[in-house]
Amino acid sequence: LPEGMEQDPFFQQFFGQQFGGPGGNGRGNDQPRQQREQSLGSGVIVSPEGYVLTNNHVVDGATDVKVTLSDKREFKALVVGTDPKTDIAVLKLTGDKFNAITLGDSTKVQVGDYALAIGDPFGVGQTVTMGIVSAKGRGNLGIEDYEDFIQTDAPINPGNSGGALVNDRGELVGINTAILSHGSGGNEGIGFAIPINLARNVMGQILDHGKVTRGYLGVVIQPITPAMSKALNMNKLEGALVSDVSAKGPAKDAGVQRGDVILGINGNTVSDSNELRNTISMMQPGQTVKLTVSRNGGTKDIEVKLGELPLSKDEAASDTEKGGSKESLKGITVETLDSDTAQQLQLPESTKGVVVTGVDPSSPAADSGLRKGDVIQEVNHAPVKNAAEFEAAMSKSEKNGALLLVNRGGTTVFVAL
């Protein structure tokens, strides 16, 4: 086995422990010895000076990094910087000028384009596999904080992480990062690559500033579901719904409001909340952007000067009284929120609304994601302070559906019924 291959976590998932440890003969009968953990991955030389793009998870925690080229030459590498939020790392090889790959433009990649995955799967040596681009803009997979993956069926296996995804002109369009596998650890035709435009942006910031800074709007956003689209009288499932606005954020200062739907940035359509988040994150603090928002049936443009993404988020708070239990429409039981219940839910005592005390598991409310303990504060943008107001508001919304503002553990989200 190539040195270190058996320590790769993907290798262990695929083959188990049957091959023994480092230095073993595969029979598992070596004497115990002190071991040094090793792992492997791939990378791409992107400049003649020897800068290399790879994944953060390939080098995370490494004390020494060694790079072996396809011609068997070996080089020590310095980790210049990393960005765990996108899983990008930048390395620097020590040595003379290097042959570098040509960087492409990932915005020009189309579904159906040929794609080649280049890397060192299982440590067997440089390997090229071929497929097509299966999809673009894959997000919300829970792999990284910022996701805009190119999906490909070009076979990607353990050891390919950090390697190149190239187009039919040999241009680098992505950094292979992850595979979707049902327990085997091997390729099943669904691989994901970070677009080169995103990787290039991160690398540029690391080289220029030594760190990555991101633009910040100061809003909490969520996707537009079909039920929400109906409640908001929208014709298309596009944009990002603003479910909360930071009291001290740039969006608040510019006039963005909770319940706005952000449809565009600088004249470009925003397809969903993931695209909005990624687009803002690639912009720099201090940059002014023009947001196109939908509000109360009309659209307007709002200019926002971006701040810098903070390490923590501001939490939204609201305002209370007592009331009896009420059976509401669409499968939920609610009760007017009092100060004692607000304290139990770790909300300010002054919070007003109705607390969900029960949800019928076969009801539309359960399907929409409402939970016991949720605090409903608005129905169709109108505040509700007690169970009676909530009941009346829900009765009026039977025809077109209801858009509920829900406070869940101090965070507000919209739920459509």
What residue ranges belong to the model's regions?
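Glycine-biased strand-turn-strand hairpin within the trypsin-fold
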Residues: 1-49, 60-66, 73-74, 85-88, ...
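Beta-strand signatures of extracellular beta-sandwich domains
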Residues: 66-68, 264
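Active-site loop architecture of trypsin-fold serine endopeptidases
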Residues: 37, 62-65, 98, 118-132, ...
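Solvent-exposed loop/turn segments at secondary-structure junctions
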Residues: 59, 84-86, 97, 107-109, ...
